[in-house]
Amino acid sequence: MASEDKSKALAAALAQIEKQFGKGSIMRMSDNQITENLQVISTGSLTLDLALGVGGLPRGRVVEIYGPESSGKTTLCLQAVAEAQKLGGTCAYIDAENALDPVYAQKLGVNVEDLLISQPDTGEQALEICDMLVRSSGVDVIVVDSVAALVPKAEIEGEMGDSHVGLQARLMSQALRKLTGNIKRTNTLVIFINQIRMKIGVMFGNPETTTGGNALKFYASVRLDIRRTGGIKKGDEVIGNDTRVKVVKNKVSPPFRQADFEILYGEGISRQGEIIELGVKHGFIDKSGAWYAYNGQKIGQGKDNTREWLKANPAIADEIERKIREAVGVKIEINENQGDEEFADDAFDA
């Protein structure tokens, strides 16, 4: 009898909550709205998509990407924007640093004509614009570049040298409290780019920290630490960077994995380079000395030549990528135009 009374009381409470706050304000975990598959947007890096465990950056969540200067933070964000646009998504870029290069973005595959861009005057304006775009439900990806450039209005209007302790941290904390619920409800991916600072007087442990206080660390579902690990040379010329990304926080899959890939100057993340590395690792591409082979046919001597061969034969590159994704159990949406190409008759001709 007590159990029946509890059930009736719970049913009455649920009905009252839905009446007061609207349908869907409380539900069981078995309801479709909660258990539907997580939607993701590719980072543009196959290796990083696999390291994230779900095939990309999760929609309806906050993501933080941080690292030293010139480590590839903006490149990674623009690649994610390009991937979202390929699937028909609408993207916005809040350029608080006033440093976005549209020519470079276009080289990475971003449709700059359709990209929404804002260059706000203050941190409050930037975050208010972000909140309004999220609440519109019409934008799929929003990039905020960067947290360090979100200067509070009081600091801009004050004198140079004035002390404004904790202003930016309070601004971020207040904004994220408002944003998080709307982001989840509208299934928007919001990416914050952040910079690194050094703590003063740290004797033990890591002296590095990110700007904007601790709020973003808590609210972010995914945090990526991106670093440049070396240069890529073609002869004496440096043509790109070796890059490593560590997944330091991940609420949608196991964290602490890392991804290594190449960023080529003027091109962005080298998809072909990743396919070669992962293809060899999973046994789809054979490597003998300097030669690489696929299905028993030689496709290139040295990584540079093999990369160029895969660029010239995108259908075969797509096929190898699909095999890699199937091998690790991670799939992702593919643009309708992809995969329809026929193999060239002379694709394997040496």
Swiss-Prot record:
It is found in: Cytoplasm. Pfam families: RecA, RecA_C. Disulfide bonds: none annotated. ATP binds at G67, P68, E69, S70, S71, G72, K73, T74. PROSITE patterns: RECA_1, RECA_2, RECA_3. Keywords: ATP-binding, Cytoplasm, DNA damage, DNA recombination, DNA repair, DNA-binding, Nucleotide-binding, SOS response. The keyword DNA repair applies. Belongs to the RecA family. This is Protein RecA.
